[in-house]
């Protein structure tokens, strides 16, 4: 009798194990993949909000450096180790865990978000034909912000454009597509970096001109064609192109 019960128990366990294999193959509940997030227009709009937020975070870190490295502020006892290093001029270029890494990471967070918008956004026009102009405007703003980050990164991590006669010195990576976590991107010349910046700003101007303009008094807080022209003027100034 005992042997019979043991065999029956084993058979039930075996049946349960084989029967559960299909049950366990379920989608993650409460989690959204990148593809599913961008399947709706609302996801694209939320991503743009996040893009502006990440840009703000970058400049929050960027502006801190000038203040902390000057005598404009007094360091408080509860200052972070990172802030103390900047204040005491201990933030070194080779310090991969300090401020040089912080700015690099913050800027490329912005670039990554912009690349996702620019990769998935155009496909939504087929699903939302009535909102095509809104999508164009969102894409235009993303192009501008990506160009802005490439310019800021080149200012921090490269020499100025005229450092060599043909701008053949090292620029910064300019990824234009979503990347895997472990992807590596080569650093092009600064001339190639600026070529990408100018291309992004050209695309931004075209899409912003074709897209629905922002209204309601809040447009001054967002990217516009005027902002594109202003940034283009700054880029040409850095290039020494005054024509």
Placement of each model-derived feature along the sequence:
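Conserved, well-structured interaction surfaces
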Residues: 83-157, 188, 206-209
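Bacterial Sec-dependent N-terminal signal peptides
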Residues: 1-30
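Membrane-proximal, proline-rich intrinsically disordered regions
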Residues: 20-69
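Short coil/turn linking the two alpha-helices of tandem helical-hairpin repeats
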Residues: 154-161, 212, 238-241
């Amino acid at each position: 009798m005992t042997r019979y019960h043991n065999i029956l128990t084993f058979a039930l366990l075996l049946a349960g194990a084989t029967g559960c294999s299909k049950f366990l193959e379920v989608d993650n509940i409460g989690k959204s993949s990148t593809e599913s997030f961008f399947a709706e227009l609302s996801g694209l709009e939320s991503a743009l909000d996040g893009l502006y937020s990440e840009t703000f975070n970058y400049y929050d870190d960027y502006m801190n450096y000038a203040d902390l490295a000057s005598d404009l502020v007094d360091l408080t006892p509860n200052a972070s180790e990172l802030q103390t290093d900047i204040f005491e001029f201990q933030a070194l270029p080779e310090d991969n865990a300090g401020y040089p890494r912080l700015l690099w990471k913050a800027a490329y967070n912005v670039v990554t978000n912009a690349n996702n918008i620019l990769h998935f956004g155009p496909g939504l026009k087929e699903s939302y034909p009535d909102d095509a102009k809104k999508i164009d405007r969102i894409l235009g703003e993303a192009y501008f912000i990506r160009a802005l980050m490439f310019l800021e990164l080149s200012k921090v991590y490269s020499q100025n454009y005229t450092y060599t006669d043909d701008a053949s010195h090292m620029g910064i990576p300019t990824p234009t597509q979503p990347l895997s976590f472990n992807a590596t991107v080569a650093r092009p010349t600064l001339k190639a970096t600026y070529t990408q910046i100018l291309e992004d700003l050209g695309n931004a101007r075209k899409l912003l001109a074709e897209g629905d303009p922002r209204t309601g008094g809040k447009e001054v807080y967002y990217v516009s064609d005027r902002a594109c022209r202003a940034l283009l003027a700054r880029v040409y100034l850095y290039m020494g192109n005054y024509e």
